[in-house]
Amino acid sequence: MKFLPLFLGVFLVLSASARDELPPVTTVSSVDLQEYIGTWYEIAAIPQFFERKCVGNTTAEYALTPKNQVSVVNSCETKSGKLSIAEGRAKIVDPTTNAKLKVTFVYFLGWRYLFGGDYWILALGDRYSYAVVGSPNRKYAWILSRTPELAPSLLSEATQALTLQSFDTCNLIFTPQKGGHQERTPLCKTPIGL
């Protein structure tokens, strides 16, 4: 009889933690890499250590390589006004959808994906006007656009895609862009259209 309270306590703790588990992150059903390559402007992102010098005008340039990888060139403006550039590679992890990639910026006698990060394409706008990218652990997320400013209706769609995947949109911060949003404010605190 002494074990009944202990059993009930363990059961309640396990039940509560099971309810708190988030559903797995899912990707789009397919990505046409020919449509995806090109220049993307960072509209909002979860701040990362590798972007700590960046103050705005952050872009990513993607191109296909002869080895069926994606060349990645990220650039941003620093506080001093200089351009910071990082080159990397992405390999396709799920060739049936092209929606899961592994990105690395480590090159030593070849690109080292062991140190790479998950780059999952979670949502795409019509004609690839925007992309929502994240990681399965929800520690990384970006809203990317083909233009420095994303129309309010498209920003709303992209934000909703993150919310439906249980990302905390307060963790995403707007990236200042010339011709776009100018303040580093949380995505969740900024009314759509400002």
Where are these regions (language model features)?
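A beta-rich soluble binding module of mature secreted/lumenal proteins
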Residues: 3-194
